[in-house]
Amino acid sequence: MYLAIEGVIGVGKTTLARMLQPAFEAGLLLEVFEENPFLSNFYGDRARYAFQTQMFFLLSRYYQQRRGVKEHMDAGRSLISDYTFEKHALFARVNLTGDELEMYNRIHEALCEKTVHPDLIVYLRTDAEVLMHRIAMRDRPYERQMER
């Protein structure tokens, strides 16, 4: 079984994935943000850094999915992830326009065909105030410039 947990930033995806892992005796595939060299600049100037940020996430998640999901599925093990590969296309539609969005969509479509889709997606929600409080509490440097 491949279970993915989705929702907006700060909603508790990683926390829930870690809580469920022992109960399902599953592997854990967590989204890695810290390695994106464009992310903190993106939060400061979305228009300028959107394409680089989105492309980095797209390729990074693709390689993570190809390795992590395939490894667990081939071994017959369950897997819990705190993101879906498809999610980044939603962010691209919000942050990109014109030729950049067209380029992103073409690459995403080609890569998406090669990824394994979750058997179940759990979507988490909470109030904006709760989200902003959680984001402030974890104090990640690249999230400090986020707008509500």
What function would you assign to each model-found segment?
Residues M1-Y2:
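Pre-Walker A (Motif I) flank of P-loop NTPase domains
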Residues I5:
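Hydrophobic anchor at the beta1->P-loop junction of P-loop NTPases
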Residues V8:
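P-loop (Walker A) phosphate-binding loop of NTP-binding proteins
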Residues K13:
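Conserved lysine of the Walker
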Residues R18-S60:
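Conserved substrate/cofactor phosphate-moiety recognition/catalytic segment
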Residues Q54-M55, G68-R93, M132:
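Flexible phosphate-sensing "switch/lid" loops adjacent to ATP/NTP-binding sites
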Residues S60-L79, E109-E113:
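Short amphipathic alpha-helices and their capping/turn segments at secondary-structure boundaries
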Residues H88-R148:
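A glycine- and Lys/Arg-enriched "phosphate-lid" helix/loop adjacent to the NTP-binding pocket
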